[in-house]
Amino acid sequence: MGFEGDVRPFLEKHCLKCHGGEETKGKVDLSAIKTMADAEAHTELWEAVSFVIEDREMPPEDEPQPRDDEFAVFTEWYEDQFLGAAEAKPSEFKPRRLSGPEYRNTMHSVFGFDLEVNIIEAEQTVTEKSLIMKLLPTDPPGESGFVNDTHGARLSTTIWSQYSYLAGSALEELFSPLRSSELEVLVGTPIKGELREAQIRSLLTHFSERVFRRPLSSDRIEASLERIQSESGSDLREALKSEMKRALMSPAFLYRGFLIESDSKTGQQPVDDFELAERLSYFLWEDMPDDELLSIAASGTLRESEVFTAQLDRMLKSPRSRTLAESFGSQWLLLDQIHDDRQEPTYLHALVNQPLDFLNYLFTENRPVMELIDSKVTFANSYTGEFYGDDRKQLERYIKPRGVERVSMPNQKIDLVESAHERGGIITMPGILGMNRGPILRGTWLLRQIMGEHLGEPPPDVPAIKSGPKDKGLTFRERFEEHRADKSCALCHDRIDPLGFALAKYNDDGGLIGKNQGRVKKDAPLPEEIDESGRLPSGETFQNFQELKAILMTSEREKITRNAVEQMMRYALCRKLGRNDSPIVEGITSTIIETDGTWSDLIHGIASSVVFKETLITASPKESHD
């Protein structure tokens, strides 16, 4: 099979009428792509083409449709020859702005404290108290689907003004009596009275190393000292704060990778040790490197295999690695959409933190990747414990602090014994089921977030599924058959519906129908009336969710594993994946499947890859802290 002999004729027969020659709908022109070399020069185009062909969105309904074997020819070429023949290469080097959470965490690491706004007598999370997160606009997800992908984010005058205000506020607090201990940490010696010149030099040295995530030369430190002395007049501290603010407002602080050191040559090359340390720390911690990691980067030994592995393992064991679950895991699985109709903050906290604690356990305790789908343990407290039958008896009694009306109870790890048949894994957690109410939302979430399949947008003219007098006595599944009669709908719903209906025995709160879990509706069906059976596009059938889970753990294991690898790679690299990332994805996926690999194996595979450790320089980067 080849492009010229198989794919080009497919394009000429079914695509060029609208996407070539005089007419180029959607700004997609395929007419000039005649050879494999032409195809390789348009890598991003083929991803979009593959999606619309896979979803049968193209050709349009009113045009002659390819046969199934013709569709298969294109898909096989795209997966096996276009992606399969690619060489693993890093992407072009591009500095990117710190995301809001990265900026907040980095400011905390630089100063040793958070800028906070407290509401008296209100329980708040660290993020809710953060002045930074209240002032900075929320970063939208980039092309990768994650908010740390800020390559296309504009630095507006509004954001610049907010950076200036936050930098000034942090410096004012640092030099206040309240933060004398934090200031002494940066100075390195006890402060008695006014700062001496040696202490100012020490302060600038330590501060700049944190701000720029690498040490600056003594010449630059001396230049800063000269500016302070020339501007100080009668107020040395104000001049010092001005110089420190200058550093906090520099691109070298606000952007990742701005100070990367490169040979004068262009082309593919390893990133320097400090950039590698940054890539590791923002991947695992969403924060700047700590002192140990910076020290190893300075020694030039970070890329040595044993040293690199030891540091990665150390960082995963650190409490700071919880951000991998809270940031990556939450964005991947859309956990911010978990809600509670009861408007009860402590109950919502329990629903959200259950999957977060579970993901943190998987990521940091070296658990198998497929435990995401089926696990013998979960995390629960008295709120979520109601969904786990007698297994909740393992929970130790939590005593609420005196004088506190409401408190968020910590989760405890429990073994699933009595509830193992109905629970286990992330899919059947009450918060996940509750945010995806009904078979369509549940099936769509499972297909997209867990299995990584692409779904096109539904046709705009398809009406919602409503219940009328003629539908009395019909189940949702029966009423839905009319909707499925539309061929354009059936293409996606053949993939969505079996997954969603397999979860039909769980109510809107995520409780088991008939087990008095969650809020029970008056018109809820009896357990024996629920049809959980389904047939997947592969032809495999199941009678209930337990049988579907068995299919997910076997036949769909490769698809689920590959999606996990792709999602974490996008997050780690802060960008969408391209053709030259495919060999890394496939290599890590194969290794995990062959060895029943763990999340730690997955993380090590990404961090050790050429796309993580190297970069492509197309123009000599400037090293400047101005």
Q: Residue locations for each model-derived region?
A:
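Structured all-alpha helical bundle cores of eukaryotic regulatory proteins
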Residues: 258-270
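Extended surface/linker regions that mediate inter-domain or inter-protein docking
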Residues: 77, 102, 106, 110-111, ...
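Secondary-structure capping and boundary motifs in well-ordered enzyme cores
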Residues: 3, 7, 41-45, 50, ...
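Short hydrophobic alpha-helical segments that form membrane-spanning helices or hydrophobic packing faces
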Residues: 207, 218-226, 257-258, 382-383, ...
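Aromatic- and Gly/Pro-enriched helix-to-coil junctions and flexible linker segments
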Residues: 1-186, 209-210, 214-217, 221, ...
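Sequence context surrounding c-type heme c attachment/ligation sites in exported
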Residues: 1-48, 55, 62-68, 385, ...
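Large, well-folded core regions of big proteins
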Residues: 190-194, 201, 205, 222-229, ...
